[in-house]
Amino acid sequence: TDTISADTISDHAIIEVSEYILSEYKNHICAHADIPALAAQSPCGLAYALALIGTDDYQSVTPGWVLCHYPEVEHIIYMLCHTQCTDGCEYCNRMLDIHHNLKQLFGYDAFRTYDGEPLQEQASQAAVDGKSLLAIFPTGGGKSLTFQLPALMDGRTLHGLNVVISPLQSVMKDQV
């Protein structure tokens, strides 16, 4: 079998392919992702990542064979779909914004506050940003949503499985 390597691809071809990818996947990836670098470093890994990203089925996951032979695919998907740009492109504003997803996934216009503190919003944003956090909420403070929103957002952007382990009875009674 023939293998595509960065050595066999010209700079001009990488730029053309990068422009094509950005135009074809504009609603599926960050507009400011460094496609030329990814194409130069791992053209096959990028191709597999784009194949998965291009599906509308959020339950599609990376096949084991691909992960075995191209382990960088998961990192490429993360770089394209889950690394929020500083300029705020259309994709990032839609897919990585907790307020937009709160409305889209749960139908709520705003996060709940407790004594004027936006606990849900702060904890959800920290989780989406990949920060380690400990959130202590009062009863009825919205812990369930704080677990679920980031997990659902991750699943949609990364095409992965998220497991939320929670002893909360409200999750077991109301949402399962």
PLM features per residue range, with description:
Residues 78-82, 99-103, 113, 153-157:
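A short alpha-helix capping/helix-coil boundary motif
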Residues 91-136:
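Conserved pre-motif I regulatory segment
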Residues 57, 100, 176:
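Short glycine-/small-residue-rich flexible loop motifs, especially phosphate/cofactor-binding loops
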Residues 118-176:
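Conserved P-loop/Walker A NTP-binding site and adjacent catalytic elements of P-loop NTPases
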